[in-house]
Amino acid sequence: MRGKLLLVVSVILILLGGIVANVVQNDSGNIQVRDVRFAGTGGKMMSGLLFIPNSATPKTPAPGILAIHGYINSRETQSGFAIEFARRGWVVLELDQTGHGYSDPGAFSNGYGGPDGLAYLRTLDFVDKNKIGLEGHSMGGWASLAAAKVHPDDYKAIVLEGSSTGKPFAPEGDPAYPKNMALVFSTHDEFSMLMWGVPIAGDVVKSEKLKKVFGVTDTIVPGKIYGSIEDGTARVLYQPNTTHPGDHLSTAAIGYAISWFQKTLGQENTLPPGNQIWYWKEIATLISLIGAILLLFAAGDLLLQTGWFSSLKGTPQNPKPATGAAWWIGFALMFFIPIITWFPLTLIGNVAAKASTIFPQQVGNCVLFWMMANALLSLILFSIWHFASNRKKGGNLISYGLKTPGGMDWKKIGLSVWFAFLVIAIVYLSVVLTSYFFNVDFRFWILAVKPMSLMQTRIALRYLIPMALFYIMFAVVLQGQMRSLKGSTAKRMIMSTVVGALGYLVMLLILYIPLLAGGAVPISDVRMTLYVIVAIVMLPLFIIVSLISAYFYEKTGLVYAGAFTNAMFIAWFIAASQATHVAI
């Protein structure tokens, strides 16, 4: 009964979120959103979402805007900007960069896809070729700058959101290039040193690099327009009170972009910059995402009631978790080790796990390298605890959920693989159907669950075995060593989540409290900055995988069903959401 009720609730949430997100994205029918593909330089297929206001026709062409996401994101990350631009009568191409989303790899190639996106936008007969704007966040800004360099006469204005001009990522800026530039650089942007050479984001007004682009020597005044819009030399700096990824959730950051394009491209209607609705879509896709996670548990519960999978049902046998001081030592290790190793191991992974034809996603490889190293370290520490202490108390492979009292049950292990596959397949189907009928994915902010392309599916399959090993080890520690002997399944799930995910929350607090207090992120190497952003996603992911691990361990008495489900889910998540650097 509980599984059926959870199924109903999850389906309602998915449908509700999909319907509301679609209505907001389409502005209640005032905007048509098309999923488009087109051939770019060298025959690379490019992907985008095209937002077409009803007022834009071949007889009444409207200004066009190319909106481009940042590194390891996809086109939907720009939906807040795209929705609001389109509501103001502008045609918007929300582009997947090369090697991102559904655009062909490799990442960084062909000017990040920016020049091809601009060229495609100009082929549309309902776009006014004399009024085209470029907008890009972070690396999307570099893509926009590449477009401006390759096609200098084909755009009128540009908005750089949390981005910069200059080597090695983009052409150097000066008072004439790019034309009519607005820089929206948040007061707590994590990349201020990388982008503009200032350690504190709020000090970008003093950046010598930015002064050269503005053609001034004095401190830049935010909100003041320098140069001339008519001559194409206009410059302005806006500073919303948020972070680098926070630009996507900021009405101020989006409003500044709207305001600049109204000044440079002209107003198609009278909607002021502050009139925004995009956040309802963000809330709606979050509701769908929550529904999808609940569907995972509902599907698992109901599958265990079927004849084929009922043999997987069981209870933990002879549990011998750590107690007393040993438990607290284990908790401290599980708390500190992942966050202490996060930056060193991902940096090592940048060198040791380069993108290749086997594992073609650089950031995904770094995360996988970190996972494998942590799994090995966990195995060593767990073995020390077992042989030095817990074996004497009766702890064994049965206690840790690795085998049954009858021995290593390979049939159950194999059945657990099929069980996990069907659970994930059901959730995946809900994502595909939502994408098909409502043209949205499941997401909140920078956490997104999307349908995979064929190439991304092949990448996910390559991640499966190493990730299965990691999540088996994760479950053995979480359920075999750190499991509470008291309480209900729900209480044990909560405790598992605290043990499995609390460290990531503390890591984010350590990183972001100084930044939000007006300082900088406390890291010693600018190369680590990207993994500060990636760490944000680790918190919700480890909440989810901790819940899955605990739930299916309690339902089956073994670690495998939960571990394989986690491996498939995270392999899917990483393959679909990361940049692909090498074609396979």
Role assignments for model-derived ranges:
Residues 4-13, 288-292, 332-333, 373-376:
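Hydrophobic H-region at the start of alpha-helical membrane spans
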Residues 332-584:
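Alpha-helical transmembrane segments of integral membrane proteins
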Residues 13-18, 292-298, 571-574:
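Hydrophobic core segments of alpha-helical transmembrane domains in multi-pass membrane transport
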